[in-house]
From Swiss-Prot:
Notes concerning its domains: Has three domains with a flexible linker between the domains II and III and assumes an 'L' shape. Domain III is highly mobile and contacts RuvB.
Function: The RuvA-RuvB-RuvC complex processes Holliday junction (HJ) DNA during genetic recombination and DNA repair, while the RuvA-RuvB complex plays an important role in the rescue of blocked DNA replication forks via replication fork reversal (RFR). RuvA specifically binds to HJ cruciform DNA, conferring on it an open structure. The RuvB hexamer acts as an ATP-dependent pump, pulling dsDNA into and through the RuvAB complex. HJ branch migration allows RuvC to scan DNA until it finds its consensus sequence, where it cleaves and resolves the cruciform DNA.
Stretch list, region Domain III: 148-208
Annotated region (Domain II), positions in chain: 64-142
Listed name of the protein: Holliday junction branch migration complex subunit RuvA
């Protein structure tokens, strides 16, 4: 198992960071939130989980060990693979997921792209005794999904700047996709940050 990778960031993409380790570039799949804290040329340390398939080896990266642990625990539920587990962490923090499961908050889970009503009900049953209670004292005050719902602009802008775009370009791209985010909030769901990032990049590519 590769527990973590540490080294300078060689490259950043919308879903991937390349970390140079001993002269080798390790491609690591990350959420937009994790990517937003990385900068090309700067040192980084990512907790990692290696997913082995017959035709691929995929390394998933996380800001800390807690995110990695939750990522791996989520996959113990039937129907949850690494991509869905990562999507859940892109939408909610580890503690927000723990709170959602411990309180039976079906709405919080359906805010994740790829999880419907029946899927959420099944996950609540299967994960109830696996994730445990929230470990952060602040979670009860901030509520489930609050960081993603209210902070999607900051996440998106930081991710775009991390990819090498100027602040002005990032601001314009964020404003361009704002209606999509606001529509999600109006429906009571968290803005889909990964999809918003892709849409923002498409906007920037068209402008060039």
């Amino acid at each position: 198992m590769i527990a973590f990778v540490s080294g300078p960031v060689a490259a950043l993409a919308p879903t991937t960071a390349v970390i140079e380790v001993g002269g080798i570039g390790m491609a690591v799949q990350c959420t937009p939130h994790t990517l937003a804290d990385l900068r090309v040329g700067r040192e980084a340390r990512l907790a990692t989980s290696l997913v082995v398939r017959e035709d691929s080896l995929t390394l998933y990266g996380f800001a800390n060990d807690d995110e990695r642990q939750v990522f791996e625990l989520l996959q113990t539920a039937s129907g949850v693979g690494p991509r869905l587990a990562q999507a859940m962490l892109a939408t909610h923090s580890p503690d927000a997921l723990r709170l959602a499961v411990s309180t039976g908050d079906e709405k919080a889970l359906t805010a994740v792209s790829g999880i419907g009503k029946k899927g959420a009900q099944k996950l609540l049953l299967e994960l109830k005794d696996r994730l445990g209670e929230p470990v952060g004292a602040h979670i009860g005050q901030q509520g489930i999904g609050t960081p993603v719902t209210s902070g999607w602009r900051d996440q998106l802008q930081a991710a775009l700047i991390g990819l090498g775009y100027a602040s002005r370009e990032a601001d314009e791209a964020v404003n361009a996709v704002a209606p999509q985010a606001e529509a999600a909030v109006a429906e009571g769901t968290a803005p889909p940050v990964p999809q918003l990032l892709r849409a923002a990049l498409q906007t920037l590519n068209r402008a060039r």
